[in-house]
Amino acid sequence: IYKIVDANGGITRQQYNGYQELEVTVNPEGYTRKTSYNEFGQPVRITDENGEDTFLSYDGNRNLVLLCTPGGKQLSWDYDEMDRVVSRTTLSGETVKYTYEGGVLHTITDGQGRVYTLTFNDRYDLELLRFPNGLFRRWEYDGRGRLIQAVDVKGNATRYAYDRADNLIRLEEPDGNVHRFEYDAMGNMVHATDNIREVKFTYGALGVLKSREQERHRITFGYNSELQLRRIGNEAGDNYFFELDGLGQVVTEIGFDGLRREYERDGAGRVTRVNRPGNKWTEYLYDGLDNILKEEQYDGEVSLYTYDKDGMLVKAENSENLLEFTRDRKTGQIIEEKQGEYTVNRTYDSEGNCTRITSNLGADIRHTYDREGNLQTMQVGESWQASWIRDNTGLEVQRTFSGGVTVRTERDCFGREVRKSVRSGGIEKGAYRYQWGIANHLLSKENELTGTVTRYDYDRFDFLIRQETMQGSETDVIYRMPDFVGNLFETPDKKDRKYGAGGKLLEDPDCFYHYDDEGNLIFREFKQLQETGVKFDRKRMEKERGIRCLATGMGWLYEWSSNGMLKKVIRPDGRPVEFRYDALGRRTAKLYFGKVTRWVWDGNVPIHEWGYKVTNMQPDEEESAPPKEPTEDITTWVFEAGTFVPTAKIQDGKQYSIVSDYLGTPIQMYDELGNKTWDCTLDIYGKVTNFEGSSLNECPFRYQGQYADEETELYYNRFRYYSPQKGGYISKDPIGLNGGEKLYNYVYDPNSWIDEYGLVRNGHLAGNKHPITGVPFDSNGFPDFSNYLYSKGKNDVMITPTGNRDLDFKAANAKAGYTETPKGYTWHHHQDKGRMQLVETEIHAKTGHTGGFSLH
């Protein structure tokens, strides 16, 4: 085949050598990929679409022994006389060794000398995996090789049963929850139940999913004659439409609320322009490897991105800031990030764990890890430190902070926290007890020191719907009741709020809500006049914003930048609050009432925060240079390594230790002498219900990833803003249906799930199936692609993750023995760090999920 003409007229040209080996491929956009081969037909040089070379070397038995990336990173392998891998060298230079017994893999020894032992049965099914610390996991199979029992390291057993067609018909979880499944003659699941839920499915031609029904809540799916998804109908009967081109690519998307977006694509299928409502647009420019080089908005706002030879980001720039990244030559990990004039440096060990973070603003944070790779100590300079004691599974059982503060954690057999005790100076300053039910539902929480008991109720969709708090003779009840499509109400009869199509909150007892043509909240209008409020020019506001006031014309105004980030909030008193962001969407500044609050970031968490009056800006010595901003009274925030959980605050030479609950939500703060300075309790909306301390804003963090802005009554949640008053976001999910069909919602159960980025994840799918693809999700909310793996070769390998998809894919292909990813498949980053699975591309793309790439 030398020429391929696709349905859109795009032409792909292919050129072969004399041995019919594909040497050159030119895609419809003119980008060329070249491959050179040795005398055995093995690729030895691959030139990618950017003109960069990857080199591969083989031994005399034709085994791949070396892969060298365009940026000079290397992976290598050694083999025994039977051509089995006996060692591999990772990007960091560590050597992983393998031994075999009876023809199967027996031990894996990592670069730290930790030995993992594997035992297989006569059918080559894995029966036992023994970890370096002596713990083990077990699997049992029936005579047909089907898994019938899996036992975790704590002895918890999950049991499986099948019908004669090998369909899973029963799954019994360790907590007693029993799942039952029924299938039609084609092997499609039509009925699924457990101790809580019941779900029914219907199918069309060739097994395409037509509907999913739970408790009379029905979601439907429509297809074209090619069985390509064209429509999703939600529980209220609203439809989400897709218009496709000849290649099945989405070119028009019409949301549940009628909002329309059109996508222009180049010959390679890449989106080059998004035509948005209101004559707004966004254009994209790419390199040969599909990395975005330029993003331009309709108002002229531009973001620019630069990559190294391996396709890893090294520079990002917008009108507000220039970001520059220096990466480790071997691993590609970021070792220095420049954010304008501020610099953050990172040091790593050979396993990729961060061991030190420093900055030119004075941060010096050190981490150490135990033999199993778990965080063991953290230290800030010579002033503050924390240490961890863990059980043999790596779960925390005790944490000790500076000032003699000790946090002890008790857990049940599933690893869930059942009691947390905080002691300082030998006195218990906090004591919390938790009771859990099946499906990881938190049933109750007790503050043992105050006697306050809070009980929780859930519906059959895993929504947290009710909180009942009892203290003495007083009882307080808060409702969080969803309707058919997941819109939340604060009363059992669900009459206190009104919603529009697509989940827009239109009215509550106090306000009317107005939105722009992209679904962003632009005015929260008070129903009653406020004494401190400023009345806006009603006619002018209605004309400029395209709305019609329904009451007082007073309230909160919101303005949005062209890339969808909140730009300004005008308070009811008329004072504006303005925001600035870098090219990665991280908030770098807040301006309010003559004061600037600034942030410097360490990855996705803030490391420094400080404020100054605008009048304090000092001009540079050169008149043409912009004034230098003051950097005084800096607060350094310390987060538990690799998480969004704050652990310390360093300010004005003082150190404060932060205690968080099981979910990572801050609940207490102590000074360096062990005195409690801050104590906070949230309700099921994330609103503060009880507080002790001098200022609530002394610790502004709420749910993981959220920063409370007292000026706006909103929580900044990385890519969006969360309103604790409404229990949801004030703009749509920017990742669309990939975050679920509830585009304004926070997670279903905020007692068990978090949304660190403001991009709703898959917690609500835990224990269920994806509504579009039917892919099952485990109890932790991760997809199980076992039924959609590549069947003609290796489909599950371990690599050292680099943080770059293309580089990870190359490593996975090399490990699996492929010169390129098999057509129709893609590599999925499993939640287990470094594990890659070869999965059907279409299934992977349509199964909106959070995978290992986001986590690690």
PLM features per residue range, with description:
Residues 1-498, 503-508, 512-515, 519-533, ...:
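Extended charged/polar low-complexity repeat regions
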Residues 39, 517, 562, 583, ...:
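A cytosolic small-molecule/anion-sensing beta-strand core signal
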Residues 434, 484, 494-500, 648-718, ...:
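A motif-centric feature for acidic-aromatic and gly/ser/thr-rich catalytic loops and repeats
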Residues 519, 664-666, 682, 721-722, ...:
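Cysteine-centered, disulfide-bonded loop motifs in secreted/extracellular proteins
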Residues 524, 668-669, 687-689, 720-730, ...:
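Short, low-complexity export/processing leader segments characterized by acidic and small residues
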Residues 543-555, 624-632, 815-821:
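Intrinsically disordered, low-complexity acidic Ser/Thr-rich regulatory segments
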Residues 658, 668, 702, 745, ...:
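Structural recognition of the beta-strand scaffold that forms the well-ordered cores
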Residues 760-826, 830-856:
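Nuclease and nuclease-like effector domains acting on nucleic acids or nucleotide cofactors
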